[in-house]
Amino acid sequence: MKKEIIKWSKDFETGIKAFDDEHKILVKTLNDIYNLLNEGKRDEAKELLKRRVVNYAAKHFKHEEEVMEKYGYPDLERHRKTHEIFVKTVIEKLLPKIEEGSENDFRSALSFLVGWLTMHIAKPDKKYGEWFKEKGIVIEDEAVKID
């Protein structure tokens, strides 16, 4: 039976459908990685993490930042910096830990990703959602597709 390490919640909704859909993909991906680890499929979990968490998150971040820039979101630079720090942390610290470390190291990295995503969606992402709503800006973009 599939388990969830992170459960999607209405509390995560930004009010921007495309971004909420992208966040749901990231949440599902972390749950898929968790289940692959529990099934002893560490190599598949690693590949999924690289393909979806690293690559898809980068596309998602770019999408968010482009929309924020287009509409003049005032906290764009801070938000962009948060994304840059996350990507750098994943590439420089988590990926080597996952590649070379034990299963516990992998699980620790996964816990970090869950915590970061939860906090990031619940705070800075909700903040931009509220800003767009206050300004009466409706985003009609489609969610970035999975490769």
Swiss-Prot record:
Segment forming the signal sequence:
none
Which amino acids does the record list as binding Fe cation 1? Answer: 23, 60, 64, 125
User: At which positions is Fe cation 2 bound?
Assistant: 64, 79, 83, 120, 125
The answer, when asked if Transcription is one of the entry's keywords, is no
Q: Does the keyword Cell cycle apply?
A: no
Q: Which UniProt keywords are present, listed alphabetically?
A: Iron, Metal-binding, Oxygen transport, Transport
Alphabetical list of Pfam families matching this protein: Hemerythrin
GO MF annotation: an example: oxygen carrier activity
Function statement: Oxygen-binding protein. May be involved in a storage mechanism or for delivery to oxygen-requiring enzymes. The oxygen-binding site contains two iron atoms.
Q: Give the quaternary structure.
A: Monomer.
Q: Which PANTHER family match?
A: BACTERIOHEMERYTHRIN
UniProt lists the family membership as follows: Belongs to the hemerythrin family.
Q: How is this protein named in the record?
A: Bacteriohemerythrin
